[in-house]
């Protein structure tokens, strides 16, 4: 009944959740994101790439897509959209719709790039281990880095073409 608590993966997820809450509460994630947006945010494409870089930096340490995307990236994206006077309705296409789609898709890419970027990834590694396949953080990263970087480069441009 309590055998699940003996699984190290469950404890890794629990501790990472506590750390992600600390990053949100202290505002560290927000400061990291605003740093990258400030460096690259001269145009809307730069803002999207800045948000992507911020997500790459905080992604390995926050194993929850909802905590990272909804707790850190979304409020920043919303503030940027407000600064461009982009609100739901007729002005949504000014910045808000583009940023909302780009940030949510970027968060999905980050979840696949790092073993610790999503709570389910360590469970996948544990399942693979039970079948005799060892997946370490580095093997996951090396397998996902090239498609992840290509996706992060292409995605904002593709979304920009649509909007």
PLM features per residue range, with description:
Residues 65-69, 84-163:
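Juxtamembrane and boundary regions of transmembrane helices in multi-pass small-molecule transporters
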Residues 1-88:
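Membrane-embedded alpha-helical segments and adjacent helix-loop junctions characteristic
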């Amino acid at each position: 009944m309590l055998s699940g608590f003996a699984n190290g993966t469950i404890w890794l997820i629990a501790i990472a959740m506590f750390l992600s809450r600390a990053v949100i509460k202290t505002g560290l994630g927000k400061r990291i994101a605003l740093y990258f947006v400030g460096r690259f945010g001269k145009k809307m494409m730069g803002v999207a790439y800045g948000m992507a870089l911020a997500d790459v930096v905080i992604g390995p340490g926050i194993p929850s897509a909802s905590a990272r995307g909804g707790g850190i990236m979304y409020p920043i994206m919303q503030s940027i959209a407000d600064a461009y006077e982009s609100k739901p309705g007729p002005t949504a296409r000014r910045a808000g719709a583009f940023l909302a789609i780009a940030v949510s898709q970027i968060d999905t890419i980050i979840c696949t790039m790092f073993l610790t970027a999503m709570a389910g990834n360590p469970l996948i590694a544990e399942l693979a281990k039970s079948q005799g396949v060892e997946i370490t953080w580095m093997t996951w990263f090396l397998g996902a880095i090239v498609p992840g970087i290509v996706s992060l480069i292409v995605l904002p441009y593709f979304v920009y073409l649509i909007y």
